[in-house]
Design a protein with these regions (language model features):
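C-terminal extensions of enzymes
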Residues: 87-151
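Catalytic alpha/beta core domains of metabolic enzymes, predominantly
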Residues: 1-93
Length: 151
């Protein structure tokens, strides 16, 4: 399922009450909504391939919030917000190009080239992605929520 509306619909009409069904978040921008409001038990994210530690922390914070940790819920929402621009790349047709470029920027040189040489982000798109990756990395480095532990 796609965005918030689709997740909410799936939770209300399909997965709730059936122990044989599980809801997963498949859109990066909907992690908190899917887990905290729809009962999703897992996530499949593009940005998680680029920034695994922050996305795993987001998942952990959501689980803690579901167990009543109000601070974890606040931190989950902060992290979700900080990841938002990078996460929106998941919603468009160029998601693979964006995430491969971000992986390249993080030192994974094997992601520099694509199957088709003409298939690449524009210079403006590259600059936008790089600026937002740097912004997130600076934010993450100083964010106290990454150290939040369960009681």
């Amino acid at each position: 399922f796609g965005g918030a509306q689709a997740l909410s619909y799936a939770a209300e009409h399909i997965t709730s009450g059936d122990e044989q069904l599980a809801l997963l978040v498949g859109v990066d921008t909907q992690v908190c909504h899917g887990m905290l409001r729809c009962g999703a038990i897992g996530l499949i994210t593009g940005i998680g391939n680029v920034l695994p530690q922050p996305v795993l922390k987001l998942f952990e914070l959501c689980l803690m919030a579901l167990n009543g940790d109000a601070q974890a819920k606040s931190y989950a929402n902060q992290l979700d917000d900080a990841l938002m621009v990078l996460s929106t790349f998941d919603e468009g047709p160029e998601l693979v190009l964006y995430y491969k470029y971000l992986l390249f920027l993080r030192g994974e040189s094997e992601y520099e080239f694509h199957f088709n040489a003409f298939d690449e982000l524009s210079p403006s798109q590259k600059s936008f992605a790089e600026n937002h990756l740097k912004l997130f990395e600076r934010w993450w480095d100083g964010w106290e929520g990454k150290n939040h532990q369960t009681n």
